[in-house]
Amino acid sequence: MKRTPHLLAIQSHVVFGHAGNSAAVFPMQRIGVNAWPLNTVQFSNHTQYGQWAGEVLAPAQIPALVEGISNIGELGHCDAVLSGYLGSAEQGRAILAGVERIKAVNPKALYLCDPVMGHPEKGCIVPPEVSEFLLDEAAATADILCPNQLELDSFCGRRAQSLEDCVNMARSLLQRGPQVVLVKHLAYPGRAEEHFEMLLVTAEHSWHLRRPLLAFPRQPVGVGDLTSGLFLARVLLGDSWVQAFEFTAAAVHEVLLETQACASYELQLVRAQDRIAHPRVRFEAQLLAL
């Protein structure tokens, strides 16, 4: 029997709706990966509603929980760590210590950092200390880095002006340590407005992918969290980088189609679960000569 991969997902959680682990854990489990959620914040709902209740996890709890998993002999079974939204830079450093601990017992374990800072259309949503931590410390530790356009621009200290510029900027991030950079959402000047564009860059190659941009009265939250989670899960299941890239684009599009059909502000993950596992659409990533 083929072994089920395990990953530790360290990011935000909402009680109602889907963001952070609430957007990523179920889809990862649905496609065959055992996700262990460790929630950096627990809020009633995502913050785009304008009001919420809840609290940030004390940073000391992260190593304590990792230690608890170690004490029952399970830490060595962890194949990857995923980190997303951080409530503080101190939380981030606790996560990196956890990554180091896991890699000490499983050197093959991967670390995917989703450097959540904000959205190209909404601006930065995290304190400066978190941005600085992501730029200066997290990127150097990550095996897989998954910024959006705002975050790519922040890492490189300037705004991208073209697709080629985005490729060069992503490639420059590889020099900090990651094996691969997945840009979840491109928003460079002159792009086709009717498409949603993504980029995958390794040291040897770069791939560009387009899917139709679906219209919503209010854009659903959690799409980036879903994207990062599915990409990492597919890699753990044995996909190549580009196979995971194409699967992720298709599965996320299926969720958005279901969400649009339901006229919902929240991602319709439960209704779309079979479409996540077996996407009916397919998008082919184009190898770029750049």
Curated annotation (Swiss-Prot):
Which residues of the sequence carry a binding annotation for substrate?
A: S12, T47, Q48, D225
Record field: catalytic activity: pyridoxal + ATP = pyridoxal 5'-phosphate + ADP + H(+)
Q: In which pathway does it act?
A: Cofactor metabolism; pyridoxal 5'-phosphate salvage; pyridoxal 5'-phosphate from pyridoxal: step 1/1
Q: From which domain of life does this come?
A: Bacteria
Keyword Transferase carried by entry: yes
Q: Does the keyword Transcription apply?
A: no
Q: What class of enzyme is it?
A: transferase
- Which cofactor does this sequence's record say it needs? Mg(2+)
Q: Which residues form a coiled coil?
A: none
Q: Which UniProt keywords apply?
A: ATP-binding, Kinase, Magnesium, Nucleotide-binding, Transferase
Gene3D superfamilies per UniProt: 3.40.1190.20
Q: Could you mention a single GO BP entry for this protein?
A: pyridoxal 5'-phosphate salvage
Which GO terms label this protein's molecular function in UniProt?
ATP binding; magnesium ion binding; pyridoxal kinase activity
Q: CDD domains this protein is in?
A: pyridoxal_pyridoxamine_kinase (cd01173)
Where do the annotations place ATP binding? D114, E151, K184, R211, P212, L213, L214
GO terms for cellular component: cytosol
Q: Where in the chain are disulfide-linked cysteines found?
A: none
Pfam assignment, any one: Phos_pyr_kin
Which EC numbers does the record give? 2.7.1.35
The protein's role, per its UniProt record: Pyridoxal kinase involved in the salvage pathway of pyridoxal 5'-phosphate (PLP). Catalyzes the phosphorylation of pyridoxal to PLP.
Q: Which family does it belong to?
A: Belongs to the pyridoxine kinase family. PdxY subfamily.
Self-association or partners: how does it assemble? Homodimer.
Q: NCBIfam families recorded for this chain?
A: PRK05756.1, pyridox_kin
This protein's name: Pyridoxal kinase PdxY
According to its UniProt entry, this protein's organism is: Pseudomonas putida (strain ATCC 47054 / DSM 6125 / CFBP 8728 / NCIMB 11950 / KT2440)
